[in-house]
Amino acid sequence: MGRIKKKGESGAAKNYITRTQAVRKLQISLPDFRKLCIWKGIYPREPRNKKKVSKSATASTTFYYTKDIQYLLHEPLLAKFRDQKVLEKKISRALGRGDVSDAKRLEGNAARPENTGKPSYTLDHVVRERYPTFVDALRDLDDCLSMLFLFANLPATSSVPAKMIARCERLCLEFQHYLIVSHSLQKSFLSIKGIYYQANIQGEDILWLVPYKFNQRVVGDIDFRIMGTFIEFYMTLLGFVNFRLYTSIGLKYPPKFDATKDDKAADLAAFTLEGAGLTSNGAQPDAIMEGTSESTPDPKLQAKVNKLVKELKSGEDEKPKAITNGEGESETPTDAIDKFEPAAPGGDVLLQPSYSTSDPSQLFANCTIYLSREAPRQALEFILRAFGCKRIGWDEVLGDGAFTTNELDPNITHQIVDRPPVTAVDNDEGEDNQTAQKVGGRVPGRIYVQPQWVWDSINDEELKEPNQYAPGAQLPPHLSPFVKARAGQYDPTVPLEEQQTEAEALKGDSDVEDEEEADGAEADEDDDEAVLAIENGEMDVAGSDDDDDEEDEEADAGFGGFSDAEVDDASEDDEQTSAALQRQIELEAELSGKSVKASEADKQAADPKSKAKQQKRKELQRKAKEEAEDLERAKGMLSKKKRKLFEQMTYSNNKKDAESEKLREKRRRIERKMAKGKAT
């Protein structure tokens, strides 16, 4: 006979442990327990039945796996936390005894990261445990970069020390330097939250958010303790990643840092890159641009490769012979690129190849750009340098490290301004350094654009037309480059006629006709009112200017405002006019022997265009009804599980189609309104 199982010794009660029990088992404080769980990646768990798991009368809210807590018992950081706890007790006892000198001595041994910025422990082993390979670290770099860039822009407070902010900013600038040298930056997008960046490092897409540069106001209801715990781990992680990235392209890490330039707000210019990956003139070779380090090839293998290249070149120099088919017709090879069409009507839109041989990473290589004071200098400098621009200038008040601080430099080809042009005012005392932006003060031969020109150019991998981005011009919509166009969904870059369905096109045409009829009816009413006014003798005949002046003087002298009786008479006249018009329409309908609605329907039926549209609309309705019936019959052949899954898919697809149709309808109204405004 087996032994009777006791309650709480097996099953769910054994697999879970409460937070209080875990803290007591590890013999550390609750804040240290939170830190340890964040760094080791251990999260609370939700059991299926809390009553079976809880061993106390009170309902516990936080549970952990027992195996996870058992795993934490072997963590080396526990010894550091316990030593710190013992030291804090010794300091409190010394102060209780009144021994200030002993308490001061012990305080010197205590680790105060909020004051020194250097904790008594390191998280290197934790990073190695959580990320066994470098690719794993790259895949988890999104949140790391977003948090570090956020803290780099925060002001120093008691909860966020200045040394922590300085280290975050330095790590972020080092990462930006790698992106500039390797040309790994792919896309960027301006949003309300901040600026999104996307880079491709060793085949992994990394997306992070950078807040705008302005004075942050830190409120008191934010818990910086938890965020600071994440920042400690993320700083160690990004340090590892930067070291690996720099060494992979032959650069020394960390790069030389000039504190003097950093005090002058040089940002990227405060760092000097060194290593075998850089040439003597500071240019980057092709190996760095590809993201790999240089290596000396084998001489024998290189000789074979050179021989093979010569043979290929000699084969290309020979004239291609004409190809004849079975009918004797000759076909000459063409350089046309195949166009990839989707296999199914609802398939994804395929990327088409092009003849473009230009490197997107060198998009601004031939440009010398000057940034005005109101433009976001840090973001623009990073993007322009990442896409090949070597000559970037700005006003000296924005910081050090500019190619030129003279706005009137003749070598400048583009100037980025972010304010509308204003009329220049003569000033005898001297003119400001930004007067070239003013009307009549522009430098001849220079292109003036707004900052959005840079973002749209890098997202489309081509320099956009500067006329659309001129100062004061209405900018084109800034679309997100991270959204991929899918068949059937609304695409703002495609004309409306190419993506709308037949039913939507018919509905749009009918709306246009209704608006035209409404406008025509209003015009007819105005004409009828004018005719009635002439018949009643109320039309004014144009006289001389002297008569008009005399009439105006008499009216000004004798007018004392409208009386209530006159207002009532005017309203009665309007009612009589509208009633007369309605009576005339009814008489015409009586003479023809039909009702008013029937006569209007006959007018529409007499129009061949409206008849064809009505016929087409009926055909579309019949076709949609047949497709729905076929779909219902096909669903009857499915199993219950698959039918439910199919209904869920259909519901989500119909919801997306409705949203796309709503956006297309909104665009149709806007385009119609703009066309009407241009016509008037």
UniProtKB/Swiss-Prot annotation:
Residues 315-336, 494-680 are annotated as: Disordered. Keywords: Coiled coil, Nucleus, Ribosome biogenesis, rRNA processing. One of its GO terms (biological process) is maturation of 5.8S rRNA from tricistronic rRNA transcript (SSU-rRNA, 5.8S rRNA, LSU-rRNA). Residues 597-610, 617-635, 654-664 have a biased composition (Basic and acidic residues). GO terms for molecular function: ribonucleoprotein complex binding; RNA binding. Residues 359-471 form the BRCT domain. Gene3D superfamilies: BRCT domain. One of its GO terms (cellular component) is nucleoplasm. It comes from the Eukaryota. Its main location: nucleus. Residues 609-680 form a coiled coil. InterPro entries: BRCT_dom, BRCT_dom_sf, PES. It is found in: Nucleus, Nucleolus; Nucleus, Nucleoplasm. Residues 665-680 have a biased composition (Basic residues). Residues 511-530, 543-556, 565-576 have a biased composition (Acidic residues). Belongs to the pescadillo family. PANTHER family: PESCADILLO - RELATED (PTHR12221), PESCADILLO HOMOLOG (PTHR12221:SF6). Component of the NOP7 complex, composed of ERB1, NOP7 and YTM1. The complex is held together by ERB1, which interacts with NOP7 via its N-terminal domain and with YTM1 via a high-affinity interaction between the seven-bladed beta-propeller domains of the 2 proteins. The NOP7 complex associates with the 66S pre-ribosome. HAMAP family: Pescadillo. Component of the NOP7 complex, which is required for maturation of the 25S and 5.8S ribosomal RNAs and formation of the 60S ribosome. This is Pescadillo homolog. The lineage of its organism: Eukaryota, Fungi, Dikarya, Ascomycota, Pezizomycotina. The gene is NOP7.
